[in-house]
């Protein structure tokens, strides 16, 4: 028994690195950041999307995480990417899930309608399995560390979103370690 217990302590979970074809998937998630908005320090919600093949990003700020912001974030992100992936990967947040969880979750009526209109499949992660959408989890941290430090001092949320779009455009010049092309070059290849 002791030997089995010792072996169990040494064995760790193994995860297969995820690999995606062009335009196969986008991962989406919410984050939170602090800004000085109109002279008042406050928390805002940051909407993050990452195209899984190219690594392209879309980030937008909202006052709250609700269904309207969720759907608007998806539409704006798809416009930014210039197309629709075959699937969008998200967690089990109430704004997207009517019932169930993980692979058995059922999308809310509005999210289902949006997915039908744009012809993508909504895919939900299993609970406590952050690695299933690790690309966008990394993006939330990246944006919080790089864009929101120091704390931005802006007049309006529209001004903040304009600066976030500029940040996304500059990110397209970034080269992801292990890739031969820049994010922007890979994004263009996704559109072909």
Task: Give, region by region, the residue ranges found by the protein language model.
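Mobile-element integrase/transposase regions
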Residues: 2-57, 65-72
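Active-site-proximal acidic segments at structured loop/helix or strand boundaries
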Residues: 140-192
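Active-site beta-loop-alpha junctions of metal-dependent nucleic acid enzymes
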Residues: 59-87
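Two-metal-ion acidic nuclease core segments, chiefly of the RNase H-like superfamily
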Residues: 104-122
